Amino acid sequence: MSEQMDQRDRPIGVFDSGIGGLTVVRQLMAHLPRENILYFGDSARVPYGTKSPETVTRFSIESTRFLVRREVKFIVVACNTASALALPVLQRRFELPMIGVIEPGARASLQATRNKRIGVIGTLGTIASGAYERLILSLDAACTVVEVPCPLFVPLAEEGWTDGPVVEQVARVYLQPLLDTGIDTLVLGCTHYPLLKDVIARVAGPSVTLVDTAEETVRAVREQLEVLDLRRNNEGAGEGERRFFVSDIPAQFSQVGGRFLGMPIMQVEWVDQSDLPWFER
């Protein structure tokens, strides 16, 4: 087998602070079913959204090293906070092609908006970084970007509270200030939020287009794999292999993560941090 063919068979590496990035894996499985996927959830140190930029960057470097040592061919930073705060550092430090979730979402919002008023919801860390606003305005300075943090959405999604009157009331409290500004496009700037898409869409109303960053990121991944000739699409390639690693509590990851992935997670591998640095294993 040629080196390039061997490269194509290597997995796509995906990392997140916990389980939210599984919504990206779900889209990868749907749109690139032949690709092998290796997922790492840094569940021992979740959430990233409330931590300092320096800490998020350090954690992201360690997660990336783990994936690199597993010989992945492409890396998806499936965490909005890490994409906002650490992606430029990762791209300088590592030679592998990689993508975050912010740029695909920002570009899709510009394609979707009709009145150039775009809303963004995300974690405290993502919104405080201003990453979406900076990128959107750098691409179209005529836009107005309104960003609101929605910290309760993550625990609601992880607890399985994805609809109902309580969730709808929380969504109304968060979204009403955005809707009052006249936005016609809303970026779901956290990989947990696709689980709440139905209730968010209902509260936002039919005049507001939702941009799912997980979907948009996978579109961008597919394009980049084709440009780099790294797509695993040979005739003999069956459905890809999926492996899941976490830094803490594999059983909980399997239980909750299944909702994010849309199917049971049968095996999760725990990365032991007790002696060697875990990313060197």
What are these regions (language model features)?
Residues 2-281:
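Non-catalytic structural scaffold of enzyme domains
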